[in-house]
Amino acid sequence: MTDIRYITAAEAAASVRSGDRVYIGTSSSFAYEMVDALYDRKDELENVTLLCSMSITPCRMFDTDWPADIPAGRKGNPFIFDTFFLGAGERSAHRKHNMAFEYTSFHLSQIDLWMREIGRPDISFLQVSRPDESGRCSFGSSGICDHKYVVEETKRGVYLESNTGSPYIYGQDNLISLDHEKVAGVLLTDHNAPELMPDKIDDISRKISKIVVAEVPDGATLQLGLGKMSTAIGYDLEQRNDLGIFSELFSQPMMVLMKNGNVTNQCKGFMDGMSVFSFSAGTQEMYDFMDHNPQIYGAPFPFVNDARNIAKNKKMISINSAMAVNLYGEVAADAIGYSQQSAVGGQLDFVKGAQWSEGGKSIIALSSSFMRNGRRRSKISLQFAPGTPVTTPRSEVQYVATEYGCVNLKVLNMSDRVRAIISLAHPDFRDQLTQEAKDAGLIR
C-alpha cells in the first residue's frame, strides 16, 4: 500500500467548506468522531448540508439545542440534514433540538439514483472496518447499503474512519482500499459500533406475532423490519425450521434464529447458504456474530431491494409494519398527516417481490388501536388524516394482520375488503366504521 494519509478527526473536518454537502453515515455505520469534529466548526461555517439516514448514534450534532433565533444555515446554526430515511437520531435532532431538515421520498431500491441526483456529496465521512491483509476495508454493518454510491458520487474527498469495532462483512460492492484514488485521509479509531437494544415486547405485539407466524411455513425466506412487533415475530419464528433470510435489515432476532439452527438458508433457491441483507442495527453481540462470518452476505439496497431479486427466493415472506390502514386497504407507514416519522423505505419493494415469489406472501402488521391522553384511538379509519401519504397502494396490499386476525385483501372485492378490514379493528370502533362505510357507499 502506498500514498495513505493518516489524519485526525479535526483534519477531516477542516476539509469542509461553507456550502458543502457532507455525507456522514447510515444507521450503525456512522463516522461520529469526524462528525463531532465538524460540530466544533459550527461558528465558522455556513449552509452545510449533512447527508445521513437511520441514525442511531448519540452525538453532539444531533443532541444540541440549535438556536431558534439564528436562521438555519447561518453561522452558529449552519447545519441542515438531508435524508431519505429518518431514524431516531434525525427525528430527535429536528423535533427536540430544532435542527432543520429536508426529506425525499425514495424507495431504497433507488438509492443509487438518490445519491447521484440529490445527495451529490462534496465530502464524505465513512466508518469502515480495519483493513484486511490486502489493505481493503469493509463498509461495515450498515455502510454496505449505500457507501458504494457515496464513493462514486463524492466530488472532492472521501475520509475513512477505520474502526476496530466495525465488523468486517463479506458480500458484494462492500470494500474500499485505504489507497483508493478518492480517499483523502484515514482516521484510525477504536470504539464499539453504535448499538440498538431490542424493543420491549408488549402483549399486543405478542398476540399479533402468533397470528403472523401462523402464516409462515417451514422453509420460508424472511424479510423483517425493526420495532417491537418485528422483534416479537422474529423470536416466535423459533417454531419454524429451514428458514432463510433475504432482508434489507439484519436484526437481533435473525442472529438468534441463525444460532439456534432455525435459519439454514438451504431452501431459498437463490443465494443459498447465506443470510443476505443491506444494513443492520443491534447489539455488540450481533456485530461480533456478523464479523468475518461467511454465512452473512451484505449487498447494496439496489440489489437486495430489487423486487426481481426478492422474487427469486422461494416462499418469500415479507413482514412489514404500518402506522395506519384505511378502509380501501391503503397503508400509511412513514407519515401521519404532515409529520414525517420514518420513510417509504423498502416496504413496497418487498411487498411486490414477495408476491412474485413462488409460494410467497406479503404481510402488513399493526396494532388495531393506540392510547393518547387516556383515550383509545383507532389505527383503522375510513380515510387518513389530511396530508397523510400512502406508502403502499391498495392494489399492492395482500395480507393485513392485527391482534384480531389476518385477512388476504388481494382476493376480495371492494365491499368484502371493507368488511374484512373492519373485522381487524378494535371492537370499540367497528360499529362506527361500519356506519361510515355505509354512508360513503362502500358497503350496503
Regions inferred by a protein language model and the residue ranges of each:
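Conserved alpha/beta enzyme-core scaffold
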Residues: 1-444
